[in-house]
A protein has these predicted regions:
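Generic detection of long, well-ordered alpha-helical segments
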Residues: 1-4, 90, 161, 165, ...
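Surface-exposed binding/hinge segments that line
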Residues: 1-125
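Basic, nucleic-acid-binding surfaces and adjacent catalytic neighborhoods in DNA/RNA-processing proteins
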Residues: 22-43, 169-299
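Phosphate/anion-contacting hairpin/loop surfaces
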Residues: 72-194, 199-206, 214
Length: 299
């Protein structure tokens, strides 16, 4: 599943490619991709004739703000891709479910083999304070709060390490309200938005913490180390345009793979030597997912 760095890479590319462009037509080949709407016709009517004013992101969600104040929200799910093509004559990949055509030419295509992702148009509430925010994100500063109020469907999302501002000690206070394993908490989208199985492993390795350490057991030094690892890992992955694994399901807006997979320290490196201590990286199954870590460097 694309995580925050992959979605942020798409956001940056979309901001350059589609802002200021008017939507000429929308076609929907699979209604499951727009399942929040009563029909594909309803979804199309909300988009056709509208102009994209800006592109944002919160957690794993892309947000295309339209000229009437509505927002086209895109979640890629497990296998979704957004592809920008200059010519409508370019062959469409298999599993192309939604196509947005612009008046100035070219298309934006949503491709999703497993159809767990979705697109929907959100209308801002009449009252800006009508939807309660997540207990975690509600205490944060930055741009995230404004996004949650404009798109109430995302009000449940927790702290976004890029869009929200939060001190490390406040982050530590929130961690200490939970006794479960730290990896599961980082992946809980109501606690931290945008982190998934891959980057949680990388962050915990950088912080020297085991995946199953109780969150409320972290010392102040460990909290600070984890906070720094979260911010630095995400920034580095964004700089390298995200991670594409062996299946190469993640592609950027132009169909190119990411580059950060070459910098993975533990993820998908079972049996390979740890780059710090040279002991082998271990893989265990937790909650139906694979977790990769170093038994010697992470405590």
């Amino acid at each position: 599943m694309p995580e925050l760095p992959e979605v942020e890479t798409l956001r940056q590319d979309l901001a350059r490619e589609v802002v200021g462009r008017k939507i000429k037509a929308v076609s929907v080949a699979n209604g499951r991709s727009v399942r929040r709407h009563p029909s594909a016709k309803h979804f199309r009517a909300l988009l056709e004739g509208r102009t994209v004013k800006s592109v944002g992101r919160l957690g794993k969600y892309l947000l295309l703000t339209l000229d009437n104040g509505d927002t086209l929200v895109v979640h890629l799910g497990m296998s979704g891709q957004l592809l920008r093509v200059k010519s409508v004559k370019d062959p469409k990949p298999k599993h192309t479910h939604v196509v947005i055509t612009f008046t100035q030419g070219g298309e934006l295509r949503y491709v999703d083999p497993r159809t767990f992702g979705e697109l929907f148009v959100s209308t801002p509430p009449m009252k800006s304070d009508g939807t309660p925010l997540s207990p975690v994100s509600g205490t944060a500063g930055g741009d995230g709060a404004a996004i949650r109020k404009a798109v109430p469907e995302l009000a449940h999302l927790g702290f976004d390490p890029i869009e929200d501002l939060m001190s490390w000690d406040r982050f530590g206070y929130l961690l200490h309200q939970h006794s479960g394993g730290i990896k599961a908490l980082l992946m809980d989208q109501s606690f931290t938005a945008g982190i998934g199985n891959l980057y949680s492993d990388e962050m915990l390795y950088q912080a020297g913490l085991r995946f199953d350490r109780p969150a409320d057991s972290l010392t102040a030094t460990e909290v600070r180390r984890l906070y720094r690892a979260i911010v630095e890992t995400l920034a580095d992955a964004i700089k390298h345009r995200g991670s594409s694994l062996a299946d190469e399901q993640y592609r950027d807006l132009f169909g190119e793979i990411g580059e950060f997979q070459g910098s993975h320290q533990v993820y998908d490196r079972e049996g390979q030597p740890c780059r710090r201590c040279r002991n082998n990286i271990v893989r265990v199954k937790t909650g139906g997912r694979s977790t990769f870590f170093c038994e010697h460097c992470q405590v």
